[in-house]
């Protein structure tokens, strides 16, 4: 082996016997984790080995003194905690097995396992500050023991509840086979939590300091101990350095983690750097705190790390010290040499306060870290730390329904009628008032989490039940009249006066499908000049009225020539990397410069709507349905995609073909028995006649469930009826399993319940790797590609770097 190698072992729990599971002669997903956990840059060292260096010739960048053949030594403990998407997919099977289901992860560093575990639970953003999970508190002891047998995403919380109740370790170990060492450490946390709960309003200094040492936050201690004041106010953490050598050698890496046990090595490091700069006659730099986006999850992915990293680079290029805070080991932002300093800690107010106390920054940036960073804006405002860019009040104005409606009134911009509700009765009354269908969502969410279109009162009742069960009801639920039309999106850069729109994006799927799940095209293909002018005008009004400095994302619905606003987000969005790459406009760079006081007019990219690029770029979402059992593949207003690909070509058709192939769609030549299955809702049936006719002319045999089949035959498209999932054999399942079905088109019975026939059909198609199309517009796009004579060899390559070179 020359370079990286990943080995996985199985260790027998009661001896030192082990077996090799697999060996991968390459760097792996765990290589990134190991690099961040140890400070040892595995990929960089592997690259140097690949070009001819040996380990003893490679210097350790962290210490600057040792070579790469010194194996890292750790004087801390690291916990990696997966981020699963089950908070979005409430009906999904949460069982864990040999197939990976996590969308991301967090990493935490502590002086003890207990402290690291508490940090990890706080970082994972489940609304928990200890390992106590409320649903388990309501179970009996027998139910807890029974649930220990369930190997799912919540098992660690079930074990913790069992330990709190005094269920013996032997019983837990026999069921779970979780090592006794972990059980002992979790028992310690459980004992600390129970001890705090017994304080009854009297908390000793020793209890408080012990709780802090093992990872309990101040707000948690106050809640558990039922106290209003703590024995020590503003008891701040110190920071230790990740140095790869357990302090055996002096190190100069700016990579820290918090601890309540020891000296503040970060403060010493900062003082030494500042003294060195002063001795060399260098002016003191402005310090800016940059918040990352935490774990990768559906709706908040690697796009925000792109924004955070580009923000840091621009700050450094303009004479600022950029200090990064993040907890995701998979990101570039948590490379120790990306920023001037890195703090690997949770993104919550207390952790941030500790960093601020040590760093004493001049300002912070919240607009590039997604909703995770935006949630810190209010706290930053309260403690008086200036926010570079759009102020916290403007962020709240865009998120708060009533204030946003007032903003629209001032701007004279139309939107769909909507209401704010807090319970089921109010929701039903609002649905009656504004008329069904309605779009329902909790406020302050990203990725359309728990967002749905309710077509009936029964839907309203079901969805309010889902929302109230899975969402903190401190924030209201928003109901909007659902408008059918074309959805468009813009990301704009603003300097407080002028604005620049690099381009207008159009979603191929109409409104009602989350923009993150829709095929997206730049430049927009079907807007009139009047509609484009209106979108530009409205975006400018928002930018000026909200006093946006930096980035703003606005989503519009265009229906019958009228432009409605869907939402405004005064922050970076998931489309910023996409639109930056395909237009050649370095959006984050320009936005940061605006935040630092520069004007757009002086940056060389103009203002208003930027001229269109000479290419068409299509963004196609990628899904992971085969890994998430029980999740309905039906498109809707809640985002489900886990990634995306880009297709770029001189025209829309070729770009779409590239994108669909990149996303894993297959384009088969139909055989003599090849067939397609149709089962579509009534409102979609007229549009599917043309789609079905095109497939028939290509040589496909068509099958449909009773209603769809009758409709197609009525409109002169020959179709064969097939029984539904619950029908007698041979039914639609037998047809799917025959190996003859190339495509399934299913848009019927929107809903999350996995017991519904339509959901089961779509799941079966996924399990059999049969493409399942759940939106009319996606079906049209796919069929038009199928009908074309083009293949990849006919489509020219496009080097998007040329877009930048022309500037």
Language-model region placement:
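ATP-binding N-terminal substructure of ATP-dependent carboxylate-amine bond-forming enzymes
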Residues: 120, 242-413, 422-429, 648-806
């Amino acid at each position: 082996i020359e370079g990286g190698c990943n080995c996985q072992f199985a260790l027998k729990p009661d001896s030192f016997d082990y077996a090799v599971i697999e060996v991968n002669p390459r760097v792996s997903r765990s290589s990134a984790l190991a690099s961040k956990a140890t400070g040892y840059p595995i990929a960089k060292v592997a690259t140097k080995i690949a070009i001819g260096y040996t380990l003893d010739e490679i210097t350790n960048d962290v210490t600057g003194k040792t070579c790469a053949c010194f194996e890292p030594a750790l004087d801390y403990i690291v916990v990696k905690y997966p981020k699963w998407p089950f908070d979005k997919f409430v009906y999904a099977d949460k069982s864990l097995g040999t197939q990976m289901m996590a969308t991301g992860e967090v990493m935490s560093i502590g002086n003890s396992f207990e402290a690291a575990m508490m940090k990890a639970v706080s970082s994972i953003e489940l609304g928990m500050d200890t390992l106590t999970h409320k649903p388990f508190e309501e179970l009996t002891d027998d139910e807890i023991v029974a649930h220990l047998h369930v190997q799912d995403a919540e098992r660690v919380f079930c074990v913790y509840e069992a330990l709190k109740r005094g269920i013996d370790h032997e019983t837990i170990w026999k069921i779970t086979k979780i090592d006794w060492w972990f059980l002992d450490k979790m028992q310690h946390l459980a004992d600390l939590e129970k001890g705090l709960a017994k304080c009854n309003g009297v908390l000793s200094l020793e209890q408080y300091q012990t709780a802090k040492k093992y990872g309990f936050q101040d707000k948690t201690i106050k809640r558990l101990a039922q106290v209003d004041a703590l024995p020590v106010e503003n008891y701040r953490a110190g920071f230790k350095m990740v140095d790869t050598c357990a302090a055996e050698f002096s190190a100069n890496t700016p990579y820290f983690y918090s601890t309540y046990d020891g000296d503040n090595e970060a403060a010493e490091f900062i003082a030494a750097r500042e003294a060195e700069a002063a001795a060399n006659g260098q002016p003191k730099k402005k310090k800016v705190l940059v918040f990352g986006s935490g774990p990768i999850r559906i709706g908040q992915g690697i796009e925000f790390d792109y924004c955070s990293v580009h923000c840091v680079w621009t700050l450094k290029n303009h004479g600022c010290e950029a200090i990064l805070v993040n907890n995701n080991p998979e990101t570039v932002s948590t490379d120790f040499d990306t920023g001037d300093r890195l703090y690997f800690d949770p993104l919550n107010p207390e952790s941030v306060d500790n960093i601020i106390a040590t760093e004493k920054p001049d300002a912070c940036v919240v607009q590039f870290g997604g909703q995770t960073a935006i949630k810190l804006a209010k706290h930053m405002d309260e403690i008086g730390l200036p926010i570079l860019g759009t102020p916290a009040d403007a962020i709240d104005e865009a998120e708060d329904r009533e204030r946003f409606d007032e903003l629209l009134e001032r701007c004279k911009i139309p939107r769909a009628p909507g209401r704010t509700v807090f319970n089921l009765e109010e929701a039903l009354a609002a649905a009656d008032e504004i008329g069904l269908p309605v779009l329902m969502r909790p406020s302050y969410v990203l990725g359309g989490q728990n967002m749905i279109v309710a077509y009936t009162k029964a839907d309203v009742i079901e969805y309010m039940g889902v929302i109230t069960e899975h969402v903190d009801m401190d924030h209201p639920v928003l109901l909007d009249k659902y408008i059918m039309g074309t959805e468009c999106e813009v990301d704009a850069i603003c300097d407080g006066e002028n604005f620049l729109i690099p381009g207008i994006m159009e979603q191929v799927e109409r409104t009602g499908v989350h923009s993150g799940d829709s095929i997206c095209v730049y430049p927009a293909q079907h807007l009139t000049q009047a509609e484009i002018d209106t979108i530009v005008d409205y975006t400018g009004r928002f930018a000026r009225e909200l006093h946006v400095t930096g980035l703003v994302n606005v989503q519009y619905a265009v229906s019958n020539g009228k432009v409605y606003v869907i939402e405004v987000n005064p922050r970076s969005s998931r489309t910023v990397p996409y639109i930056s790459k395909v237009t050649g406009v370095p959006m984050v760079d320009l936005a940061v410069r605006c935040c630092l006081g520069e004007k757009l007019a002086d940056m060389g990219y103009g203002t208003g709507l930027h001229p269109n690029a000479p290419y068409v770029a299509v963004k196609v979402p990628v899904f992971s349905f085969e890994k998430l059992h029980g999740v309905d593949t039906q498109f809707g207003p809640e985002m489900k995609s886990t990634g995306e690909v880009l297709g770029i070509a001189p025209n829309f058709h070729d770009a779409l073909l590239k994108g669909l192939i990149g996303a894993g769609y297959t384009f088969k030549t139909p055989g003599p028995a090849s067939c397609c299955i149709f089962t579509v809702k009534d409102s979609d049936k007229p549009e599917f006649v043309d789609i079905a006719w095109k497939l028939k002319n290509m040589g496909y045999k068509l099958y449909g469930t009773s209603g769809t089949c009758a409709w197609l035959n009525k409109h002169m498209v020959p179709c064969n009826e097939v029984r539904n999932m619950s029908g007698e054999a041979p039914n639609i399942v037998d047809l799917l399993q025959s190996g003859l079905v190339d495509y399934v088109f299913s848009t019927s019975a929107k809903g999350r319940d996995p017991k519904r026939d339509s959901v089961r059909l779509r799941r079966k198609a996924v399990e059999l790797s049969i493409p399942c199309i759940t939106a009319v517009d996606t079906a049209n796009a796919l069929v038009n590609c199928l009908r074309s004579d083009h293949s990849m060899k006919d489509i020219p390559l496009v080097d998007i770097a040329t877009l930048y070179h022309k500037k």
